């Protein structure tokens, strides 16, 4: 049923109308509709109807289901009326970050920006690392950790890389990826960086953003090992090449 007895469109009709609306606003290459897993059968009907009405739009529309978010402490429950909204969760995470950086003497505007950036990264990482179709178990403490698998850890690694680049810029040093130092042994970090294009392409083709999360976490881990074992700004003949590795790391993490 697409039109009820009162002549009003049902949800099915609205979804099909939305598909036409998207096409009218600007022809798209692919439209991905993400809903809760409970909507899977409902969208089978929608997609079947759309394929009959407008096959071209249906061919480039994909429906993906995802699980629901649950908290590790089990405190969220719709029956108890304490469901947390996305904005509410971000605000809560930002408040926790604010407490952690309260002694850093940031200006108010700067502190607010940092709080928001870290909160968003924490939530995005926690959501995107989970394969579609499965429930997301959200642990606030792990999500805000600067160690291990978390958004803030990725941010910390990128800030560390950019700090090295800023120091190099102040000294008027230039990254040189074209001159491989004599006797240089390829580092694990370099091998990871080479995989960036294929990782992004595979994630796109498979609609699997969790692959990018896994990859960027590995890059961050390898970079921190590289940073701990190598003195980048050492005045040696390999300095320019090592700087190029740091710059490439910064670019890759930023674009993930």
Features from the language model and the residues they span:
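Non-catalytic interaction-recognition regions
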Residues: 1-256
């Amino acid at each position: 049923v697409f039109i009820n007895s009162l002549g009003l469109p049902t949800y099915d009709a609205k979804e099909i109308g939305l598909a036409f609306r998207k096409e009218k606003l600007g022809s798209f290459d692919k439209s991905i509709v993400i809903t809760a897993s409970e909507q899977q059968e409902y969208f089978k009907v929608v997609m079947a109807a759309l394929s009959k009405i407008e096959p071209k739009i249906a061919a480039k529309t994909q429906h993906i289901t995802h699980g629901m978010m649950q908290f590790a402490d089990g405190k969220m429950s719709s029956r108890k009326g304490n469901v947390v909204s996305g904005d509410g969760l971000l605000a809560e995470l930002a408040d926790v970050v604010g407490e952690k950086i309260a002694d850093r003497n940031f200006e108010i505007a700067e502190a607010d920006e940092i709080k928001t950036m870290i909160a968003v990264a924490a939530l995005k990482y926690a959501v995107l690392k989970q394969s579609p179709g499965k429930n997301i178990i959200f642990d606030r403490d792990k999500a805000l950790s600067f160690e291990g698998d978390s958004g803030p850890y990725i941010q910390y690694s990128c800030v560390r890389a950019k700090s090295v680049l800023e120091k190099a810029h102040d000294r008027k040093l230039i990254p040189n990826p074209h001159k491989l130092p004599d006797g240089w042994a390829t580092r694990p970090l370099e091998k990871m960086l080479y995989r960036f294009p294929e990782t992004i392409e595979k994630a796109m083709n498979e609609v699997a953003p969790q692959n990018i999360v896994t990859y960027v976490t590995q890059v961050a881990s390898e970079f921190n090992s590289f940073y701990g074992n190598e003195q980048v700004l050492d005045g040696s003949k390999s300095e320019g090449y090592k700087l190029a590795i740091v710059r490439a790391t910064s670019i890759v993490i930023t674009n993930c």
